[in-house]
Amino acid sequence: MLPVTDSFPALAAVGGAQYSAVVAVAELAYRYRTPSAVRYEVGRSEVLLGTSGGGTEVGPELHPYFFTGFLAEPGPAAAGMLGCAAVARARYYTPASVIAAIVADPVVTSNGDRLRFESFSGCCGVHARLDLLPDALTGQPVRSGSTNVDFNEGMRAALGGAAVSGPLLLSVGADEVAVRTLGASVTERKVTLPGRWLKGFGEVQALARDMRLVAELVGAEAQRFIRGVPRNARRPLWAVPAGRGLALAVSSQPGAACLAGPHRLAELGPLLRFARGLRVYGPPVGALSLPVPSAWELDLGAARFTLTVSPEKYRGFSGEGALLGLLADAEAAADADLISVLLAWDPRIDAGRLSAEAGLPAGRVTAALGYLAASGRVGYDLAEEAFFHRELPFGAALETMHPRLVGARELMSAGSVTLAADGAGAVVRSGGVEHRVTFTQPHDTCTCPWWGKYRGTRGPCKHVLAARVAAGRANDARPGSVAAGSAGDVPGRAAARP
């Protein structure tokens, strides 16, 4: 059995994720000491969220207690929590061969001054996050960390009504006094999480880092656009800035955001009455771009609710390959170990501070943060344009779930890579065939059929990965090498975002 992550050494024994030897699936056991519930008191409602396992600022805990306080704006906060719960239970695309549903409980992270709720759909194509910002909370969280939270059926049914009945007190976990008062016993529920679901959680963070603000709509314009999006569109649509709003087109153009499977934005609907604006994010595209992921963020005043959707409704994030270059980079892995020691549950990670404290160039810090995203240890906040610290209890297995990465390492071990004398590429022998890799921008190219099919849109093929690793090692071995200070020598490494 594999350990959960270095940061969760005790979870395997206390109900965290257990992994099979081939790491095709993970069985996650949720053990809640106090199942979530809504209670009604005189003049107020109380939402008590049960917690199961997790890491905190003082180490792993069985049932972390993070926060008790009133919500400044109960309506949007409750609607956002219900939206996260809905995405966790949804499958927006169901292949004919799929019968069982994946229902993984949301994750909540306490970052010292805010709470973040995250969930991931069963089809691996939609990621949801609710950020309750400092102004949304009366008082600060008592502890920092991440944990799973129970969103059982009864609690979900009562939450909507509680939000409109007056002041709302939220508790994430319970202190010992509350536990004794409630007299609760541990309840357990197990869920099997496929490898593609686990990988997808990391892919979302890496893809978000490359997105930019495409458009910002305010008030009624935001509501009008979301309500007017056709839910049954069979092909990807493109949202194009037009005046103060957005128009939908059937083909890409510069400055547009892709929207494949518009029905996947359904969870924005119940929040529209609270929305002050809508921000749309996506990677740079051109006139002939293939479908790409996008993010749709509702401004709720003291909170934000964001849906990030994959490039196609039938295509989960786990196939994007955005993290493969970083996972193949031994230097990034070593730097990530150093950087992880310096993380302190920051709501906004200061890459400059990490660079100074770790003594690493900015490019290596950026690569290390990308590596930590792959292992579920940092997320990316589009509004803040920065990573934030959070720990997910299923990170250590992610690296072994990427067959292209495994294939690249096998090619390296077999001595199948011959670098070009001019450093512009390599010849990689695989399956009795020689494939030519060319190092170029924006994507390295390869003559293999897999690269010809996807042309870099799903990350590098195993031949490109092997060639880049070989080039990096050759550069490191060169006398007087300055590779340590270069962001361009390592696959998947991006320049630091301003």
Regions found by a protein language model. Name each.
Residues M1-P498:
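Long, low-complexity, compositionally biased intrinsically disordered regions
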